[in-house]
């Protein structure tokens, strides 16, 4: 019998690895099979032994997605006799991300709470983690969007051409080993990528979403991001939150955040938000910050000039062309785009792209690729497999789309592929219309050389929690990561790490980037962290 159990254990642990000495039992409830297998492989590679059959006295750690999953698997009575440490999978993710074992005490699951006597009957699969990308284009946060979009860029135009962000096509990177994403060919393949968290606590996430927008408008991106990180955690929580005691072990939910949640579940409102909404300056700056192209500095200047409404801004001569368009189509741009509409527009772009340049690869990234139900805008990531034909494509593509009356107004247009400047990336930001409609939608195109396409696809798929984690992980290993590559970081004369090197590592697929950084592979629809 002992021999049989031995065959079920993962073989050959590294005796000197980070997890050496650990014997781990992994609760499968709420975890996708592929993710579970990856975690097991990582544990074994780094020294742990996996116990597949049952929790024996040799088991040192039991990992679970949450307390409900643990209770559902074993029951409270049986758990009370375990000598192993009961811990969240988040501990494993954070350890793998940082490259060293995280403090176990912060991830322990406790079973002595009276409110957990009865486990829930059904538990949704959850795949999680967390991030923020560098300052980039500003759009109003919606709980359905899940993208954090930072500050205004140069020339007061919203969104730097070098800064990835927002929404797009299904989970299309067919397999981790393939470099070019493929378009799904059936409703079945598309539906499997849809992101559907339990979302039982919109009373909390909607208030946090409003605070995100206010803090962004005030230029306080760090505070804004703290609420942004908390929202996916709350969205994925499998039950209605009635007490903050339910959240004490969750990542990204600190004491201040728990105090806000307690006030919301107790009173149905948040005094901090009410204060902001009654403050004329905050209210006005927040409103102006919702205009495409207007960041915190510009919003404050407009307020100090005496403007208080969007109607006032229509007579403001200092607005740029892009800001005037953002003002003119303010309501259109704020209107979210249904998933089906994004899919149809993406297919139109692929068809026109193929007519313009056979073999071109066009993928809609961002929230849509991550499986969200709606998008704030469309982020289109483009390349060509031969590594050369993408040069000059965007100019011809935009011209054709304008002839079709699909692209209507330009915001930003910069080309570098033919000159070889700016990493050879071409950029177009503008407004488009769905066929048969006049409602303006925001659309961005980024055309990448094939050899850096994987970096662009990761960056423009997001989410921003993931992007930030990957950047920090790269920095910890002596690299700088952005949408154009992974570069060895140079050092200043004082020995401090400075700017990035000039040559990027050659990593042709998203999975190769994840693997090099040592971050567990996530399918696009798993990246709503």
UniProtKB/Swiss-Prot annotation:
Residue segments, region Involved in primer binding: 370-379
Catalytic reaction(s) noted: DNA(n) + a 2'-deoxyribonucleoside 5'-triphosphate = DNA(n+1) + diphosphate
GO terms for cellular component: nucleus
Swiss-Prot/TrEMBL GO biological process terms: base-excision repair, AP site formation via deaminated base removal; DNA replication; double-strand break repair; double-strand break repair via nonhomologous end joining; nucleotide-excision repair; response to UV-B
GO MF terms held by the record: 5'-deoxyribose-5-phosphate lyase activity; DNA binding; DNA-directed DNA polymerase activity; manganese ion binding
UniProt cross-references to InterPro entries, sorted A to Z: BRCT_dom, BRCT_dom_sf, DNA-dir_DNA_pol_X, DNA_pol-X_BS, DNA_pol_b-like_N, DNA_pol_B_palm_palm, DNA_pol_lambd_fingers_domain, DNA_pol_lamdba_lyase_dom_sf
Segment forming the signal sequence: none
Compositionally biased tracts (Polar residues): 153-175
Sequence positions that bind Mn(2+): 377, 379, 444
Region ranges (DNA-binding): 213-227, 295-298, 418-459
Catalytic residues (UniProt): 260
Domain BRCT intervals: 14-109
Cofactor(s) needed by this chain: Mn(2+)
Region feature (Disordered): 119-199
UniProt keyword annotation of Cell wall biogenesis/degradation present: no
SUPFAM superfamilies: BRCT domain, DNA polymerase beta, N-terminal domain-like, Nucleotidyltransferase, PsbU/PolX domain-like
Coiled coil (residue ranges): none
Primary location class: nucleus
Superkingdom of the organism of origin: Eukaryota
Induction remarks: Induced by UV-B.
Binding, dCTP: 336, 367-370, 376-379, 467
Composition-biased stretches (Low complexity): 182-193
EC number(s) on file: 2.7.7.7, 4.2.99.-
Assigned protein family: Belongs to the DNA polymerase type-X family.
Function per UniProt: Repair polymerase involved in base excision repair (BER) and responsible for repair of lesions that give rise to abasic (AP) sites in DNA. Has both DNA polymerase and terminal transferase activities. Has a 5'-deoxyribose-5-phosphate lyase (dRP lyase) activity. Involved in the repair of transposon-induced DNA double strand breaks (DSBs). Involved in repair of UV-B-mediated DNA damage during seedling development through an excision repair mechanism. Involved the repair of DSBs induced by high salinity and DNA cross-linking agent. Functions via the DNA non-homologous end joining (NHEJ) pathway.
Name this polypeptide is given: DNA polymerase lambda
Provenance organism: Arabidopsis thaliana (Mouse-ear cress)
Lineage of source species: Eukaryota, Viridiplantae, Streptophyta, Embryophyta, Tracheophyta
